Amino acid sequence: MYSQQRIFNSKYFIFFIAVLSIFWLPTMSARNLENSKNENGISGSNSGNGKMNSQYNTGSPSAYYSAKHNLRSMLMAPKDYQQKLHAKIPLNLDLMDFLLEYEDEDRSKRFDDYGHMRFGKRGGEEQFDDYGHMRFGRSI
């Protein structure tokens, strides 16, 4: 009994897929084709001079609209994806000068002698011991 019901269900499923592929998919593709024709301004009827609609012969959209689209996508994008409009490094500094200056100032503040990052001070003494391990409790 159970195997016959299972066979009936599988036959019903195959029949449903066949009907779907025969009737529904061609109508959807034809509907998409109609929509694309309407968006491009193509009409099936010919005008009096034997040519298609005048919008069909105008060509591709101008660069003005594509640039406007790109500008809109840049301005509406999340902050992470937006282009930076200003330089992070001032123009009068050379890149090597900037890197050397950055390394001298901030590295001594942020890292200890072992290369471990400092997170701040606790009670006037450093938060790390001589081996770079973080102190949590009493001082040594």
From Swiss-Prot:
Belongs to the gastrin/cholecystokinin family. It is found in: Secreted. One of its GO terms (cellular component) is extracellular region. It comes from the Eukaryota. One of its GO terms (biological process) is neuropeptide signaling pathway. The modification Sulfotyrosine is found at Y114, Y131. Callisulfakinin I is a neuropeptide. The existence of Callisulfakinin II is uncertain. Residues 31-109, 139-140 form a propeptide. This is Callisulfakinin. Residues 1-30 form the signal peptide. In brain, it is specifically expressed in four pairs of neurons. Not expressed in other cells of the brain and in the thoracico-abdominal ganglion. The modification Phenylalanine amide is found at F119, F136. Keywords: Amidation, Cleavage on pair of basic residues, Neuropeptide, Secreted, Signal, Sulfation.
